């Protein structure tokens, strides 16, 4: 199920579906939590998320999912979100990697998402090195 906001980012509405897409597309999940009565949320939607650079970065590296306060209260509680706007980044297994609260100018927002991406890559590399089964598969693949 998809919802289109006034920009080119495709916003999913199901976290489970976003995880499936992230896994099949080798991306991270960006979960955004907003409130219609929140000035910082509206500024984030109307300025930051409409920036070409932000749209391009999110589309390239993330599957985006959006939740609105009042409508998606269950998701706010599930993820422990009490302040808005909140941006959470998850790996394709649903592990939270990054959480930032508040308004960010476009360049700073891209920088923060880039940090989340690096953190996810570092975590994945660490897990890969620590998993003997994955190491054996990698060695076999390299020998082929």
Question: What positions do the PLM features span?
Answer:
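Short amphipathic alpha-helix with an adjacent loop that forms part of the alpha/beta core around
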Residues: 77-79
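Non-catalytic, surface beta->alpha helical segment in thiol-disulfide oxidoreductase systems
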Residues: 49-50, 82-123
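Detector for the c-type heme attachment site
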Residues: 42-46
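CheY-like receiver
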Residues: 18-21, 75, 112
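Short active-site neighborhood of thiol/selenol oxidoreductases, capturing the structured segment around
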Residues: 25-38
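N-terminal leader/targeting and pre-domain segments
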Residues: 1-25, 118-139
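Thiol-based oxidoreductase modules, predominantly thioredoxin-like and allied folds used
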Residues: 7-13, 33-35, 47-73
